[in-house]
Swiss-Prot record:
Listed name of the protein: GPI ethanolamine phosphate transferase 1
Species of the source: Chaetomium globosum (strain ATCC 6205 / CBS 148.51 / DSM 1962 / NBRC 6347 / NRRL 1970) (Soil fungus)
Location of this chain's protein in the cell: Endoplasmic reticulum membrane
Protein's UniProt keywords contain Cell wall biogenesis/degradation: yes
GO CC, any one term: endoplasmic reticulum membrane
Annotated region (Disordered), positions in chain: 715-737
Membrane-traversing stretches: 37-57, 386-406, 418-438, 441-461, 483-503, 509-529, 533-553, 561-581, 606-626, 640-660, 679-699, 752-772, 795-815, 825-845, 862-882
EC number(s) given by UniProt: 2.-.-.-
Residues carrying a glycan: 69, 132
Length: 921
């Protein structure tokens, strides 16, 4: 017989119920609702960095210690996405991983087959051991672990939802399998020295998703029984300690509930298996689970605390070697009570029989050790936060300075660098780099230091541009009323940006903004409304339609085939209406006896093909969805047809090159129909309706902005569009020799950039939230990729998220043409605005508290950070979409009273040819 209890660990990715007389029903808070971080916390006792979820699954071993690595040998069965991580990260030959093929992870079918595979192969191992002496001897050693990764319920929950009959049937399969494996091990060993732990790496929401940090996704079961595990604590006739509203309907009020953290499970497993605690474990051994006496518990608690203190000691020594003036953690410094003294005191308590006091002292020492680890982790945070904040502020200032230099002054003022400025910036950067070199800081620190110095040095070099730009932009503000109006507008702009920050948490904020924005045309007076009544009504209705989506739950809950078909039908209807009313649309939505241009039959035929592809996408999607709902899997023909429709539809714009129709409204329709089939295939609910409403808002916005730009009697527009103050002689000369084909930006254009920014946020938050990025439904991608493939499926989901942004980039590109501004001008303004949000979210990031708070704040910051890069990328997308597009002649020539440089360009060309001047104003 072995002298140590054997350990069997069952991991399952859903909340599970299992109550027996010898089982202690407990619940555990998970650190993460994602697979990899959850398994690392469970098996290694370490809370891996959140970014680890992006490191992949199959070929990224866990590069730190684990319970498996500390065991004499571990046998594991289950998913090819999880087991290889721990097999490759352990001592060679210590972990055996038996995995099924990835083709079994089919989300279009019931997932219980995955669990049956695991149970069957465990039975085969023990059956072989009865005839294989070598294997039999290996199985009877001490400190061995059996790890059964049961993925079936997770797969079934994703595909059919946790309250489906398929899910309940899968629970029965797991119930029976657990019973059979338990009896199998009891019969094989016949010594009652096996411990069992049943738990999960994450929970699951009612709609079959996880990953967003919601309590439903981070609360998981922890059920332990067998050798070394304490019996349940019963409280007959009363509510036992530990219960709350969450467990009120379990009908287990008489049994005490014990809550632990996810990393604590690794410590529990190590103790039950008789192994050392993993070297990186930060878990606290849950003593309430153990049958051991007080002396054994006291000794185990001390060993647990010493492991944490050893981690602190090693990390502190490393920090001392790289810091010029190291500031020690006060509770563990020499000035305080020395660690050695506290450990010796605890040992003395154990030797004198004061076990309970020793346990309390060990727990307190462990908390101090965790505090020390936290202190070292955040040692440089204040300095880094200050440095990064200066960098973000420098970027905002640099972006705005560049906008003024290129798109207000058209580059007529050159940067002015001084020796003092160069010396100051160089000295600052040298001092920072020297400090980093001495401290052996990561390479990222050098980037943190470089960008603030670079940005602010560039801003200083362009100080004359800022001075001249202020005159150009604010020169018309001379009266107190104009100044008050400016301050009011600035306050409104700041308020809208702050409301967008709240919109990351409360999507309903966008509803309020759209309702307010629906009345925007009224601000230009009744004369404007009379001239553009139809356009104003269209804008109003589309804004009201958009306001409804953020009142609905994120479109990741349940699949609604009828809603999908309605969205697809309306997309088809939009295309048909265009073909019928093409002359009306291309005549700027006005009737004329003679069409503005002859009909392009090739182009109309291609539009018809795109309409057909959208209809086909809807029909194939309906067939696939119904087949999978009936548990019949994804028909191969449907999968092939879905891919054909998706690829062909995205390539359709290339066909228009044969005989293009370059009218801007036709181009918008082509882009709309290009993305429509993809959106239909990848939608599960009301996203198709959003796609139509969002497109209507964008088209209305482009036309409305142009109408306001041309409207002569709008006081706001008149102030913004009035000609700039007379240029200085040298500036005029520069402008004439280096003319720009675009007009300079004015204060009015800040509103256009703000509208773009609001619509940019709505493109994402109207159908989802930050949580929906990681907590997504697989219903849509399973119509194309039914087999689990995180990278391919993730790419499909990202494609779906990007489609609305492609629409808005194309529409902004067209609006730039209609307003006569440079293509990059408004994009650069938005890039500056976006980092105001980034800086806000940077300072509210949390790494303590609930996983919901931690995950949400980090996600907010990451998304806001990527906005800047994303906006820059959209400029290139916009240029591609609107290449060769034509707007009406009156728009291209709408320079009116403004000093648009296109007139100067014509004048320069005329003078070059020796002709008369063009007479530009």
């Amino acid at each position: 017989m072995a002298s140590f209890p054997r350990f069997r660990f069952l991991a399952i990715a859903v909340v599970f119920h299992l109550v027996k007389a010898s089982v202690d029903p407990t619940t555990r808070r998970s650190s993460s609702a994602l697979r990899r971080p959850g398994h690392v916390a469970l098996i290694a006792g370490l809370y891996e960095d959140v970014s680890a979820v992006t490191t992949g699954w199959k070929l990224n071993p866990v590069n730190f210690d684990s319970v498996f690595n500390r065991s004499r040998h571990t046998w594991s069965w289950g998913s090819p996405d999880i087991l290889p991580m721990f097999e490759q990260g352990a001592v060679p030959g210590r972990v055996d991983a038996y995995t099924y093929g990835a083709e079994l992870e089919d989300f279009s079918l019931d997932g219980f087959a995955l669990d049956l595979w695991v149970f069957d192969h465990v039975k085969e191992l023990f059956a072989e051991a009865r005839t294989n002496k070598t294997l039999n001897d290996a199985l009877r050693q001490d400190r061995i672990v059996f790890f059964l990764h049961l993925l079936g319920l997770d797969t079934t929950g994703h595909s059919f939802r946790p309250y489906s009959k398929e899910y309940l049937n899968n629970i029965k399969v797991v119930d029976k399998g657990v019973q059979e494996i338990t009896e199998l091990m009891k019969d094989f060993y016949a010594d009652d020295r096996t411990a069992f732990v049943f738990t999960a790496d994450h929970g699951m929401s009612d709609w079959g998703n996880h990953g967003d940090g919601h309590p439903d996704n981070t609360r998981t079961p922890l059920i332990a029984w067998g050798s070394g595990v304490a019996k349940p604590q019963l409280y007959p006739g009363e509510v036992a300690p530990g219960h709350d509203e969450y467990s009120s309907d379990w009908n287990l009020d008489h049994i005490r509930r014990h809550d632990v953290e996810q990393a604590d499970v690794a410590a529990l497993m190590a103790y039950l298996a008789g192994t050392e605690f993993p070297a990186n474990s930060v878990g606290e051994l849950p003593l309430s689970f153990l049958t051991a006496g007080l002396k054994e518990k006291a000794e185990a608690s001390l060993v647990n605390a010493q492991g944490i203190l050893e981690q602190y000691r090693v990390k502190e020594e490393g920090k001392k070697l790289t810091e010029l003036r190291y500031r020690p953690y006060e509770p563990l410094s020499d000035e305080g009570m020395a660690t050695e003294s506290r450990v010796a005191h605890i040992r003395q308590l154990i030797e004198t029989g004061s076990y309970e006091e020793a346990i309390e002292e060990s727990a307190a020492l462990l908390k101090v050790g965790l505090g020390g680890l936290r202190y070292l982790q955040t040692y440089d945070w204040l300095f880094l936060r200050a440095l990064i904040t200066i960098g973000y502020l420098g970027w905002v200032a640099y972006a705005l300075t560049t906008v003024i230099d290129l798109h207000v002054l058209h580059g007529r003022i050159q940067p002015s660098r001084t020796l003092i400025g160069t010396i100051i910036s160089t000295s600052a950067l040298t001092a920072l780099y020297a400090s980093f070199a001495i401290s052996k800081s990561p390479l990222t620190y050098y980037a943190y230091a470089f960008f603030p110095v670079f940005f602010w040095e560039e801003v200083y070099a362009r100080r004359e541009s800022l001075t001249e730009g202020r005159k150009e932009l604010f020169g018309h503000i001379k009266s107190s009323s104009n100044f008050v109006s400016l301050v009011f507008n600035c306050a409104v702009y700041v308020g809208i940006i702050e409301s967008l920050a709240l919109g990351y948490i409360h999507r309903e904020i966008l509803t309020i903004l759209f309702v307010i924005g629906a009345f925007w045309p009224i601000a230009y007076g009744f004369s404007f409304l009379r001239q553009h009544m139809a356009l104003s009504i269209t804008w109003f209705l589309s804004c009201i339609a958009m306001s409804t989506f953020t009142l609905l739950p994120p479109a990741m809950t349940t699949e609604d085939v009828n809603m999908i078909m309605l969205g697809g039908a309306l997309m088809v209807l939009v295309g048909i209406i265009y073909l019928i009313l093409e002359d009306f649309v291309l005549s700027d939505f006005g009737w004329s006896e003679k069409p503005s241009s002859p009909r392009n039959h090739v182009s109309r035929t291609l539009v018809g093909i795109q309409i057909g592809l959208t209809l086909l996408a809807a029909l194939v999607t309906r067939s696939s969805a119904l087949s999978m709902q009936a548990n019949q899997g994804l028909p191969r023909g449907n999968q092939v047809m879905g891919w054909v429709v998706l690829v062909v539809s995205l390539l359709m714009p290339l066909a228009y090159r044969a005989k293009p129709n370059n009218h801007y409204m036709h181009r918008i329709l082509v882009i709309f129909l290009t993305c429509a089939p993809t959106f239909v295939i990848l939608t599960i609910s009301y996203e198709g309706l959003f796609y139509i409403a969002f497109s209507a808002v964008l088209v209305s916005w482009v036309r409305l902005e142009h109408a306001i730009y041309k409207f002569p009697s709008s006081s706001a527009n008149g102030a913004a569009r009035s000609a700039p103050s007379p240029a200085k002689p040298h500036n005029l000369e520069t402008s004439q020799t280096l003319p720009s084909p675009f007009r300079p930006l004015t204060l009015r254009d800040a509103r256009v950039a703000l509208f773009f920014f609001v619509l940019f946020q709505a493109a994402f938050f109207s159908t989802g939230n930050v949580a929906s990025v990681s907590s997504f439904s697989l219903d849509s991608v399973s119509r194309l990729i039914p087999i689990f493939d995180p990278f391919s499926q993730g790419a499909m989901l990202i494609l779906k998220l990007l489609i609305p942004f492609a629409l808005i980039s194309a529409n902004l590109g067209i609006l730039n043409k209609r307003l006569g501004v440079a293509p990059s001008a408004l994009f650069m303004v938005v890039m500056a605005i976006s980092d105001i949000l980034t800086l806000y979210f940077f300072w509210v990031v949390k790494d303590e508290g609930s996983w919901l708070e931690i995950g949400s704040t980090i996600s907010h910051f990451v998304i806001a950070s990527l906005l800047c890069v994303f906006v820059a990328a959209l400029e290139g997308v916009s240029a591609m979409f609107i290449a060769g597009v034509e707007v009406s002649e009156d728009v291209d020539r709408a320079v009116g009273k403004g000093a648009v440089a296109e007139v100067l360009l014509e004048k320069t060309e005329a003078e070059r040819d020796g002709g008369a001047g063009s007479g530009g104003k």
